[in-house]
């Protein structure tokens, strides 16, 4: 393992399925941070259907990839439906929210 792991909380040098790294719990959003520094943040989220993250913005761009299911993303008042295997980039400083559908 690296002396300073830039990517943490996940096995290094091991083939894995990203969907197996975080599991949804009923009535809550579960997160697992994989990388966090001044330049990048990588976090896995798992949502049960009906759960959401309320409107907020961030200082950097945010990229989401839906691993399973479907999500409704509102970015600057525009709605996007993102399905399994699809991704969406949400620009920095634009308000956005996430809803598991």
Spans of model-derived segments:
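Short acidic-glycine-tyrosine-enriched beta hairpin
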Residues: 77-92
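Conserved short histidine dyad/triad with adjacent acidic residue
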Residues: 27-28, 41-58
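Short, surface-exposed secondary-structure edge patches
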Residues: 44, 63, 78-81
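A short, N-terminal "cap"/entry segment at the start of jelly-roll beta-barrel domains
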Residues: 1-39
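Asparagine-centered strand-capping/turn motif at beta-strand->loop junctions
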Residues: 100-101
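Glycine- and acidic-residue-biased ligand/ion/polar-headgroup-sensing regions
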Residues: 59-72, 76
